[in-house]
Amino acid sequence: MMRIERMHFEGAPGETVLVELTTPESALLARDGARLHEGERTLAQSFTAPARRDAFLAGRLAVHAGLANAGDSRAHRMPVLRDGRGRPQPSWADAPAISIAHTKIRAVAAVSTARTCKALGVDVEEIDAHRAEALLRMAISPEERKLLAEVDPQLVVAPIALWCAREACVKTHGLDVGWFGSVLQVSSIQPTPPRLTDAATGWDIEAAWNIEVRFESRAPMHAHAWQANGAVFALSGR
């Protein structure tokens, strides 16, 4: 199942197209993936693990849907490959900013509609109490834990939102930070109305937050995160 929506959020000019693709069975994914450019199919075959290959295909299908929705007429005939750091990158000049993330069961792609947007970062994680507990133990400071408890006393969803916000900011700003938990600090997490323009499209949003992230002496970075459909999503831009 594919959902396509547009949203505005702090830090990114214009609208951002957001695509969520619930990963179908491998056979169906391979069938749909056959429509991708040869260069993308070659990259997919470089993954020996079927799960990694399926995630790659789902991500490329999602980002092409986003590019088409954003009005980029080259998206149907040109591949989205990789840059020197392994990040997804359209192979044509003047392409919009994009980002891709995935879990075992879904892929998410973000595409900017504004040429002035320099970069986007999207992340997604499934909601899992064991994952939240591990993050609290290994990657979240006592100060951050207090902030999270104010918006999520059970500390199940907010820790994952914090992690996704960090990941989204790392992608947006091209940070090389190693172990994120020791260098990126969330300084604010504020409940907010969701930024999706139409909540009737099947997102089933339960909560949303604006999150401020700090790294060394940089200006504060911002991400918008939300809980929907059993997962947490986060988006950042500049």
Regions found by a protein language model. Name each.
Residues 1-238:
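Core catalytic alpha/beta fold that binds nucleotide/phospho-ligands
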